């Protein structure tokens, strides 16, 4: 069984994240969306709310699980017995960073990282932008997956 984690803060989960998960499902049997807890990061939504939003989005898909974790991503991958880490790439800067982390993860644990490039129309979408729009009470519906409720 091919199992992957898709790690991130997901504050909030965007259509870009959704696209990565949907594309990864074409070659993975199970994907665990791992919501990393970083005490040094100020988040817009509490961890419980992020878990709830994503879990509700995938409630009818038994191949998707949602979990939070507060350790190194590679340790989380080993804990859940994932063979792969899936990451989304929007820019060259993202690629350079993820390539380095992928090399370290392979050396430390033998876990491969699969990099999926964002579709061109989604490269401008980020959780940071969505949070900024939320701060100013703007409509974010075009930037989050259909059916995901943010309130």
From Swiss-Prot:
Family matches, as SUPFAM superfamilies: Nucleotidylyl transferase
UniProt cofactor(s): Mg(2+)
Sites marked Transition state stabilizer: 17
Top EC class of this enzyme: transferase
Keywords tagged on the record: ATP-binding, Coenzyme A biosynthesis, Cytoplasm, Magnesium, Nucleotide-binding, Nucleotidyltransferase, Transferase
Positions contributing to substrate binding: 9, 41, 73, 87
GO cellular component: cytoplasm
Domain of life of the source: Bacteria
Catalytically driven reaction(s): (R)-4'-phosphopantetheine + ATP + H(+) = 3'-dephospho-CoA + diphosphate
Sequence positions that bind ATP: 9-10, 17, 88-90, 98, 122-128
Primary localization class, coarse: cytoplasm
Gene Ontology BP, a term: coenzyme A biosynthetic process
EC numbers: 2.7.7.3
UniProt KW Signal keyword: no
Listed GO MF terms: ATP binding; pantetheine-phosphate adenylyltransferase activity
Any matching Pfam family: CTP_transf_like
Pathway terms, separated by semicolons: Cofactor biosynthesis; coenzyme A biosynthesis; CoA from (R)-pantothenate: step 4/5
Gene3D superfamilies: HUPs
NCBIfam families in the record: coaD_prev_kdtB, cyt_tran_rel
Role summary: Reversibly transfers an adenylyl group from ATP to 4'-phosphopantetheine, yielding dephospho-CoA (dPCoA) and pyrophosphate.
Family of the protein in this entry: Belongs to the bacterial CoaD family.
PANTHER family referenced in this protein's UniProt entry, alphabetically: PHOSPHOPANTETHEINE ADENYLYLTRANSFERASE (PTHR21342:SF1)
Assembly behavior: Homohexamer.
Protein name per its UniProtKB record: Phosphopantetheine adenylyltransferase
Organism: Bacteroides thetaiotaomicron (strain ATCC 29148 / DSM 2079 / JCM 5827 / CCUG 10774 / NCTC 10582 / VPI-5482 / E50)
Lineage: Bacteria, Pseudomonadati, Bacteroidota, Bacteroidia, Bacteroidales
Gene name as annotated: coaD
